[in-house]
Every structure is written in C-alpha cells, then in structure tokens.
C-alpha cells in the first residue's frame, strides 16, 4: 500500500525522507528552474500539480518575485503545510492553492508552464492519459509541461545502484531493501518509451528527456500550437520576409 499523504506523521517526515529516497532531489529542482528561466517571461503563470509540502514552490518563489503560481494537491495535510511555508516567507500573494486534482481548476488555457514532479508515477496506468490531458487543456498554446518520475526498469544492476545511492543519502540498509520490495506496490510505472508515447498521444509535441538518474527520468513536453496560432506565425514570417513589420 502506498503511503497515506493525508497522515500528519507522513507529511511531517516527508521533506527529510524524500531527499534520501530520490537521488539528486535538489539538483532536479535547480534544473527545472534553469529551464523555466530560459523559456518563460518575467510575468509567467505556472501550474504546480501535486505541490506537496511546497519545496518547489518555495524554491521558485524566492528566485522569481513576479511569477504567479497555482498549486494543486489532493492531500489537505500537504496543502496546509505548503500554505504555511509560503506564508512564512511572505509570498502568499503570488500563489493560489487548490485542494484537489487538476480537474478542479477552471477549464481555461491560462498557464505558461506546468510542473508535475514525482506525481505521475502514483497515477494508475489507465488514468495517466486523463491526468496529462487535464494539464494539457489548461496550458496556453505555447505552454510546456515538465515531469519527473520513476520509470519501469528490469535491470537488476540499476536497482542495486539505487540502493547504494539511497543508503549514501541516509537510508539504512534495511530501509533500502524495503524500498525496493515496495516499488511495485507503491508506484504505477511505465517504460521510458511508453511514457513518451503517452505524452505524444495526449497532444504534446517535441517530447524529450532533460534529466535522468538511474530509473528516474524527466521529460519536457511542448503543447502543440493551434492552427490559428501557426497561421499567424507563418503570416508574420512572410511579412517580415517582405520587409513589412507591425
């Protein structure tokens, strides 16, 4: 059985425990921030799916005073901790919190980017496409999605390496062994190629990996531009080619 993220005990231990479980946890968020900075405007609006206790929110808020965020999470306990964290750093005016799934948001394409970090591997396989579709539908035509999840892996050497990494990060040998034993119970993983195809079938394009540590993989997926936007872009290119500018 997966952990109960509505449990106060689980949530209180989450921030410390996640750094032991996920190799390169902090470097991951540095990568995400660097990529977002390279593509977003200073006034971007970002959707964070499964905001958890608010670590990625805090990290991004401290660096980007003009970005706005909408943060959703189905765990009220997680959400309350994230709200307190954001309030404590004086950034509540930049964040709208929503208790629930992405489907609880208004059905409008208003986000420049969406983050789904360590979330989709908890979603049942038959619900994954709907999960990504809800995100896709709420992105602007030029929006992008960034994900990071555990992939299906059958390579025993990678499992051994993961145990060594987690033990180096602070888990005991017994905890590492239990972690490996529980992977199939706690996660609904798919292979790298299946994950990529899932995003493409949802409607995303230019789907590629931006990060990997063992069986953890991060994807960037760009929303496919609408025909109207593509036609406008083509028109602008043609006008520029003929020396006409608006």
What are the residue ranges of the model-derived segments?
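N-terminal, positively charged/glycine-rich alpha-helical extensions of SAM-dependent methyltransferases
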Residues: 1-15
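Conserved alpha-helix/loop element of class I SAM-dependent methyltransferases that forms part
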Residues: 24-42
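Class I SAM-dependent methyltransferase SAM/SAH-binding core
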Residues: 47-48, 53-103
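A short acidic, Gly/Pro-enriched loop at the edge of an enzyme's catalytic core
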Residues: 106-114
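Residues lining the SAM
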Residues: 116-120, 148
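A short glycine-rich, Lys/Arg-flanked "PGG" loop and its adjoining helix->strand segment in the class I
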Residues: 129-141
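C-terminal alpha-helical "lid/dimerization" subdomain adjacent to the S-adenosyl-L-methionine
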Residues: 148-202
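Core SAM-dependent methyltransferase catalytic element
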Residues: 202-246
């Amino acid at each position: 059985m997966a952990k109960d993220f509505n449990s106060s005990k689980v949530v209180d231990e989450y921030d410390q425990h996640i750094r032991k479980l996920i190799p390169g946890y902090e470097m991951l968020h540095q990568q995400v921030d660097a990529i977002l900075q390279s593509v977003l405007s200073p006034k971007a609006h970002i959707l964070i799916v499964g905001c958890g206790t608010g670590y990625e929110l805090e990290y991004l808020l401290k660096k980007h005073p003009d970005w706005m965020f909408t943060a959703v999470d189905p765990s009220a306990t997680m959400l309350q901790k994230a709200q307190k964290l954001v309030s404590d750093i004086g950034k509540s005016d930049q964040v709208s919190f929503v208790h629930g799934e992405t489907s609880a948001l208004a059905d409008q394409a208003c986000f420049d980017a969406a983050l789904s970090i360590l979330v989709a591997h908890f979603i049942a396989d038959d619900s994954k496409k709907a999960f990504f579709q809800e995100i896709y539908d709420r992105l602007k035509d030029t929006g992008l999605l960034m994900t990071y999840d555990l992939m299906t892996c059958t390579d025993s050497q990678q499992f051994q390496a993961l145990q060594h990494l987690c033990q180096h990060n602070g888990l005991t040998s017994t905890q590492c062994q239990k972690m490996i034993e529980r992977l199939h119970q706690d996660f609904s993983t798919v292979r790298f190629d299946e994950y990529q195809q899932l995003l493409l079938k949802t409607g995303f394009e230019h789907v590629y990996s931006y990060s990997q540590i063992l069986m953890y993989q991060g994807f960037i997926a760009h929303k496919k531009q609408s025909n109207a936007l593509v036609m406008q872009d083509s028109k602008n290119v043609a006008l520029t080619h003929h020396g006409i500018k608006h």
